Amino acid sequence: MNSKKRGDETLKVLHICRQFSPSVGGLEDSLLNLARSQRQRLGIDAEVLTLDTVFGRPGKLPHRDVVDGIPVTRLAWRGSTKYPLAPQVLRHIGGFDLLHVHAIDFFFDFLAWTWPLHRKTMIASTHGGFFHTGALRRIKEIWFRTITPISVRAYKKIVACSYSDADLFRHVAAGRLITIENGINQTRFRDAASRTPNRTILAFGRFAVHKRLKLLFQLVALLRAYNSGWNIIVAGQDSNLTADDLRAQARACGIEDSLRIVSGPSDAELRGLMGEASFFGCLSAHEGFGLAAVEAMSAGLVPILSNITPFARLMQQGAAGVMVNPDNLAPGAREAEDMAAALPETADALRARNMDVASRYDWHSVAHEYARLYQQVLGRALPEANMAAAGAE
């Protein structure tokens, strides 16, 4: 690869992250959509460098791969999944104009501390930082106040993927911080929700502790006290919880017979599950952006959400749904039942309203914003034809 590029030549960008497809999650999906838009619509030669396993699954993935047209290189690693070590990353960055690091982990710190050796132009996207769970929280807080601010200095810009991330990083990344909210694939699940109003809740994503699915099961138990027609479908893949763990939680809440778990659904299968539901549920303790909620709204589902910052922002933008206080589920359950009872008259209006809010989160626009940021930090323009195509989106 040529390490030196003229302004009229293809820009080479290496996206670096610890997990990518076939792993499933908000970060993985966001990066897939961004890199795909960059390659297909902006003429940016975007590649991905990641680790060679899906956390929680046995086996190794191929060292070289192509995912949806995106070249992928995977590295062996050691240590903990919370901070996986892969120092050989330095062997793979030489031919790129810009390194785009995703999330705050080993790659973020190591590439910063070795910057005097490689001297690459770098930006980083936050994706929620590393506060997705309470695990090791005290250590994380100390790290975030001491190590992270030093690492930040090696990056031209730190991109908050949500306004809650911007609040989190505003002190450690002062002067470098900008906000570019994530987008969604607007065609993936658009208008997929059931046309027949019902009391089925769909939850989808990783089976992870911070998603607080047990809390959602407790809410369903309260809802079933109002109307026995309430049930829940949980679709996703094992993470730090398994499908058996979820069944045990549902059993403890008395709703085992009202739960259906679908492991590892394809997009087509997930779209089909949306066609069985009227509601989407997520009572997560933390979300960097809330990708699944926005995707659910694009399908026309009515969201039932915890009162964390990214979800509150969706409601402020006009989403039609229910915000639940995790410390007091009863009022949220009452509101959800009232909304379900009114669906025969209100479903079409709620569907249109939620789809409209979701339509504002478009990956083509997000990719264009990142392209402008790349121009800024590199001090050079992308080819005019590419930027004109981006502006036409």
From Swiss-Prot:
InterPro entries: Glyco_trans_1 (IPR001296), Glyco_trans_4-like_N (IPR028098)
Catalytic activity annotation: beta-D-Glc-(1->4)-alpha-D-Glc-di-trans,octa-cis-undecaprenyl diphosphate + GDP-alpha-D-mannose = alpha-D-Man-(1->3)-beta-D-Glc-(1->4)-alpha-D-Glc-1-di-trans,octa-cis-undecaprenyl diphosphate + GDP + H(+)
Keyword terms: Exopolysaccharide synthesis, Glycosyltransferase, Transferase
A Pfam entry, by short name: Glyco_transf_4
Effect of residue 162 to A: Decreases strongly catalytic activity
Biological process terms in GO annotation: lipopolysaccharide biosynthetic process
Protein name as it appears in the record: GDP-mannose:cellobiosyl-diphosphopolyprenol alpha-mannosyltransferase
Native organism taxonomy: Bacteria, Pseudomonadati, Pseudomonadota, Alphaproteobacteria, Acetobacterales
